[in-house]
Design a protein with these regions (language model features):
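Conserved alpha-helix/loop element of class I SAM-dependent methyltransferases that forms part
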Residues: 1-13, 28
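Class I SAM-dependent methyltransferase SAM/SAH-binding core
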Residues: 16-72
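A short acidic, Gly/Pro-enriched loop at the edge of an enzyme's catalytic core
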Residues: 71-83
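A short SAM/SAH-binding and catalytic strip from SAM-dependent methyltransferases
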Residues: 82-95
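A short glycine-rich, Lys/Arg-flanked "PGG" loop and its adjoining helix->strand segment in the class I
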Residues: 96-108
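Conserved class I S-adenosyl-L-methionine
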Residues: 113-135
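Short alpha-helix
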Residues: 145-159
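C-terminal helical/coil "lid" or tail adjacent to the Rossmann-like core of SAM-dependent
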Residues: 164-197
């Protein structure tokens, strides 16, 4: 709900979400979405779009679904009042091209809402794993170095005149080991090589 709340959606808005995944941003907030909006959900993966369409339902006329690369948005200039890139920009091969495209399709006064994380994200888990075996790396890619808390404003500055950072204040207490182990094993690093032997 936090990212959705930052969007401040009101009737009449034309919205584009880049990298919508399974549409969870919308399925979790569909009862709050005004009736007179137009939401274009996009993803590079047609499978993800299929999942989003299935989760939202085909009968909701507020939504359309399009597969495309966000470095080449197939819409006219000034088509959207709001563009959302929720944990997406750090996956983009050419972030500058994506920002240029977002700027192009936004209306004057339109907004980009994007999310990322920083260098200290989940640092306690990383430290725990390193203390167990210092060969383990939970992520082979440091995505925050591509677009993160520490450099995001500098990357966006050539394309957007006003940039604001809103921190999501949160903490997580994990009293049982099993969910933590499952999370660690699901990461994109080399942990399975050392932990599952």
């Amino acid at each position: 709900p936090w990212v959705y709340e930052q969007c401040q959606i009101h009737p009449g808005m034309r919205i584009l979400e880049l990298g919508c995944g399974d549409g969870v941003l919308w399925t979790q907030n569909i009862s709050s979405l005004p009736g007179k909006v137009s939401v274009t959900l996009s993803d590079l993966s047609s499978g993800m779009l299929r999942d989003a369409r299935r989760a939202i339902g085909r009968k909701d006329s507020r939504f359309s679904f399009e597969a495309f690369d966000c470095a080449r948005i197939p819409h006219e200039d000034r088509s959207f009042d709001l563009v959302i890139a929720n944990h997406v920009l750090f996956y983009c091969e050419d972030i500058s091209a994506v920002c240029s495209e977002i700027q192009r399709v936004l209306t004057p006064g339109g907004k980009l809402i994007c999310s990322t994380y920083g260098k200290k994200h989940m640092q306690e888990v990383s430290r725990l794993v390193r203390d167990f075996d210092d060969r383990i790396v939970l992520s082979a890619d440091k995505l925050y170095e591509r677009f993160g808390r520490e450099n995001g404003a500098d990357i966006l500055a050539p394309y957007f005149s006003r940039i604001f950072w809103e921190s999501y204040k949160d903490s997580l207490l994990v009293p049982d080991a099993e969910p933590l182990i499952s999370y660690i094993l699901s990461c994109h690093g080399n942990q399975n090589q050392y932990l599952l032997d």
